Amino acid sequence: MTNNKKRKASFLARRLNTLVALVVILTVLLVGYFMVRGALTEQVEAPTTTEEEFVLLPGEVTVKSGSTLVYPSLDKNDLSEIKIHNAANEQSRGEAYVDWGIKFLYDEKEKRSFGYMIGHEEDLYLDETQLTLFAAAVGNVIFSRRVVDVCDDYSIYGLDEENAIRMEVKLTNGTTYVLYIGNLNPSGSAYYVRSGDTVTDENGASYERKAVYLLSTSTTSYIASTVAALPTDMLTPLMAYPVNPELGFTTFELFSADGKIRLSLRPRTAITSADKLFGGSTFNYYAVEPAGYFSSSAFDTRIEVFEMFQGSQVMEFGTKLVTGVDEDGKDYKYFDFETDVLAKYGLDSSRVEYILRFSSKQDDSATPVESEIWFSSLQADGFYYARSLNFSTIIRVDPKTVDFLGWETIDFLDACALRVSIGNSAKLTIKGTNPNGTVFEESFIASSQLQDSEYIVKSVKAEKLNKTLSMTYYRELFRELLAITLHGSVPSDLDKKALMEETPYFEIRIETPKYNKSDLYPEGLESVTRILRFYQYTNGRALVTVEMVNADGTTSGENGSFYVRVSRLDKLLTDAQKFCNGEEFSFRDKE
């Protein structure tokens, strides 16, 4: 968690401008916004308290449209801070929700606004959409009627210090306006409010404003959804730092509840050029765990989710301040949660279902920024709940947003057990046992030429037979090879160790060429051998292992997480023998 605090607000500010808030309440606020705008642009009848001509009191302002405001109209760029005291929040959510506030900031580079909750500068952010809606609520406090010019008992309207919501609006020029928000009127359509400001009369005497107002219905709607709401309703439900879709991930790791890593991916740029030959040019990530595989196109499309990785609503923010010094001697702080709060959302340590960690860059020169999220299991209400370690929040998440949590590991990977282009195969060896017990083993040596930035196989020779074979049927054989696909995970109770002590049912070896330095491979390429071994454990299924052997003798691989269909191996064995014998055969796509 310590490392997750090493970040700057400017990083997020550069990306928040791409986000569209998903919280349902903002839709309501947007409607309210146009109601407020309409009130400012249309002529309305001036509020009156008697049949006599309405007279403005000190501090009140009438705008050109005819609307009358408790204090002057404010633009979003005028705002510096908004501080709110709402004692009613203590009973429903706790003491930390009573006093809260928003700091407004402006990013000169991006020409966009962003903000954060005061006291949570590195945790709780608001994007420009939310700030605009909030600013509209406090910037145009329109009243429909002045109830009383001088009030002697504010408690009648819920405007006494003990019960009212107190809002303090601080401007960039240092001016401050204070507004108290009390009860709703009997019909429930409008709030009673009063100003907490001091004004000066025409004689130069200063006094506290004591008038009580009834807000317009549009302003009431806005206030109810922002100032009078819980602070969590205004927060951007980000689960992690946004990912630049053009750069993707530098790391991606998904763990199960028991701490076992289900998937670990790295970008193709992080592996050797020789390894890339086995992935072709279409994959974006290769697997560190399970090793030897490449990411599937199904996962690649999920990068769009992480560009704006959000839930639907912030439910809680951390209230327990934790401070300390990290291993580098730097001070850190973060806000943690009480155990009962975590338990409420299925996020206590014994019930966390998934842990997701990834890192990403915002540009090529930037240092990768780490994100970490803990997920509950799917809860009875039909949602996941996520604990963001970056933002110290608990967020409600629609299952559609994180559908990949329910994937099997194989769903993240390419189905093809062996991805390699025919032009990058210098030597292909096939070894298997026929039904009569005889063993077939042959190596096919391919000669390739560079043509239009691609190596094209021109001829192929069977090594043992010492015979040149048909290129047409070599291509058919290679299609059979690439059609061997992963079909699922092997049973958890399978004794893989004992199985792999036996002779493999089938074996495939592919060795890439050694390429000298050229325009296509400026640094040259050493040869790499990829070995697939298949161990049959039922009549129709065979466990597959992957081993990569580098030119320097070092190896890496994966020991049997998935299975393939034996029928596909049998077809390849039969066709390889027909190929050597000069017999006709054809690729069969279906198993």
Feature names for model-found ranges:
Residues 2-591:
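Soluble, acidic/polar mature domains that operate outside membranes
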